[in-house]
Amino acid sequence: MPRENQKRGRRATEKAKKEASKRKRDEGIEEPTLKRLKPSADEDNAVTAGADYVPLEGEEYDDQYATGAADEMPFYGLLDSEEQEYFSRANEMLELNQFGDAEERRLFVDSVFREARGKELKIACSQSCSRLMEKLISVSDIHQIWRLFNKFIGHFLTLVQHRFASHCCERLFISAAPGVTQKASKTKSKKDDDIEMDEDEEPEPELPLAEMFMKVVEELQGNWGYLLTERFASHTIRVLLLVLAGEPVDVSSNDSVVASRKKERLGVVGGETQENNPSGEKRSVPESFEATLKKVMQDMVSVLDDTYLRALATHPVGNPVLQVLVRLELSHFGKSSAKQPTSIIKRLIPDENFEDDSETTRFIRGLLYDPVGSRLLETMVRCMPGKMFKSLYRNYLRDQMSSLARNQTAGYVVLRVLERLGRDDLHAVMEQIVPKIPSLIERSRTIVPKVLIERCLARGVDTKPIAKALESSYDSDPARRLEQMLRLETAMADNKEKSDKNGPPGESNPGSAAAEKLHGSLLAQTIVTAPGQLSELVFSSLLALSPEVLLSICKDPTASRVIQQALTSPASSPQFRRQFTTRFTSHMNELALDSSGSHVVDALWPATKDIYFIKERMAQELAQNELALRDSFVGRAVWRNWAMDLYKRRRGEWAAKAKGRDITNDSAEKPKSRLDMARARYAAKQSEATGANAVAAKQ
């Protein structure tokens, strides 16, 4: 369990520091037992610290089982030095991805699989070669996935708990998911390598992929209780649940509950995978999967009573699994399942009235301020039925939305609540939060005003109060206002401090400074999408910037997004774009050769669609620096996006394209003349008169 793992982790650190402590490896079986005999001190400290941690029932048994399982873990052998060297070179070649075409890479992958035949389990459990196995799986076709899956059957209970093999299982499930509805052909394609098949022929698996997934469930059956909180198996269990449900499995998303945020994103750069369906889309699955999924979910939570199920909500390892279970129960099986007394959401929240000082209210309050539990509450707020959400909001959350928004942890739950509120409730919440916006800005909690603006725009709520609050939160000088919003002042101050002192004060926390800068940029980008007084806060600041500051913003990877959004936003008026775009005319070459500034130059193309003379002046400046642009990667992209070859050779076609007209469909897009519009009005009147006469004749 996590607490015991932490103790083992501390011992591992001591072993690394002191060579003499390596003898403890032989005594490793007895030490956890001794420490489990006196858990009261640790448990008391955990409760008083506000961690809301309740040990799961049978936790000591699970720890003993896990310790014993680690000692009795099957050993599949080690790769010899020649095999290690070969697979290391294969890993480097896949990483470089310097194959001539897809066929050359396919032949290389086939050769690696032939070399790995009979050693698949060794490679999956190898610290250095398990990464190769993950990459091989990601570039394999469905037939190779089918063969490898068959090799792992019978060993999944061991593999999912292994530090390295568990990631191979996760990648295998994701890659095999699109093929569960296919019947893999037992006749391997022999059209390219008939001769090799005679030498390397291997018996074909008898089971289709769907049946193989059923075998995985059978292997893990009866062990769900401790696998939920096993640090290596838990992320594989999450993937398995999503595959059985046919839900998207996206491990690359920051919002994903599939994998840890520290997980390595292994793959082949620019490589094509065997997946026909992207991992971000829902898939069709066999009918047997739904019944299996329902049984697996019931087995996972049936061994826990309500108290320990709630304790799982604040468990660092078990919480993400519980999030997946709640999401699947409410979204996959329908929100009507929440009415069943044995449902997970009903066991977590038995009292839908949320009365004061009730058990349910105390549980929700504990989740709100818990860094781990708040993520489960976000999932519940996003997925729970409308009736339950309204009761939660009106009976508990409504009166404290402003105070919750100021809290660093509970504020994220507030964002999910804002996404579900109607127009009237959203207007009431806005009136609560608006007075707190200055303090939120001061504490760099800009994500709350950002989401509030987005929801007000979506629901049609007036944003003038937000504009006034933001105006009072920043400097009255428009130029300094944007610098404060984008955190340019603090960045310049940090740089100056580093150069003057050349010490650690300037390097105190660069991660938080970058995060604040990013959130400030996102807030400014959202503001410029709102018409009226709100967007004028940024538009007026952009016009007040000095040329030097404007260029520095354009070259900043984070802040330049605000310039791009302001140029292309529907809220920007022609008057603003006419004044603002002229400030770039003498800096086109400098910006086009910069990695961030080139995107600003690209945004100037649609921004000047109704200001042709400015666009033509910019094109002339680009044409004068043709050689420099063609020698630069980003410069060539700008040259292509501005259609400069067309500008040099067929100026008339370029002019039509610059004005937003297509030459081939010019007749269809040509605006009507006054005579044409008069004829259309006359024809409409004639048709109305004819219709009236026909009605009178019938009467």
From Swiss-Prot:
Keywords recorded for this protein, A-Z: Nucleus, Repeat, Ribosome biogenesis, rRNA processing
Record has Zinc-finger as a keyword: no
Chain spans, region Disordered: 1-47, 184-204, 494-514
Compositional bias per record (Acidic residues), positions renumbered to this chain: 194-204
The keyword Nucleus is annotated on this UniProt entry: yes
Signal sequence range: none
GO biological process: endonucleolytic cleavage in 5'-ETS of tricistronic rRNA transcript (SSU-rRNA, 5.8S rRNA, LSU-rRNA); endonucleolytic cleavage in ITS1 to separate SSU-rRNA from 5.8S rRNA and LSU-rRNA from tricistronic rRNA transcript (SSU-rRNA, 5.8S rRNA, LSU-rRNA); endonucleolytic cleavage to generate mature 5'-end of SSU-rRNA from (SSU-rRNA, 5.8S rRNA, LSU-rRNA); ribosomal small subunit export from nucleus
Gene Ontology CC: 90S preribosome; nucleolus; preribosome, small subunit precursor
GO molecular function, one term: RNA binding
Top-rank taxon: Eukaryota
SUPFAM superfamilies (alphabetical): ARM repeat (SSF48371)
Residue stretches of each Pumilio repeat: 115-150, 151-186, 359-394, 396-431, 544-581, 583-620
Basic and acidic residues bias: start-end ranges: 1-27
Compartments where found: Nucleus, Nucleolus
Primary site of residence: nucleus
Protein purpose: RNA-binding nucleolar protein required for pre-rRNA processing. Involved in production of 18S rRNA and assembly of small ribosomal subunit.
Family: Belongs to the NOP9 family.
Protein name as it appears in the record: Nucleolar protein 9
Gene it is expressed from: nop9
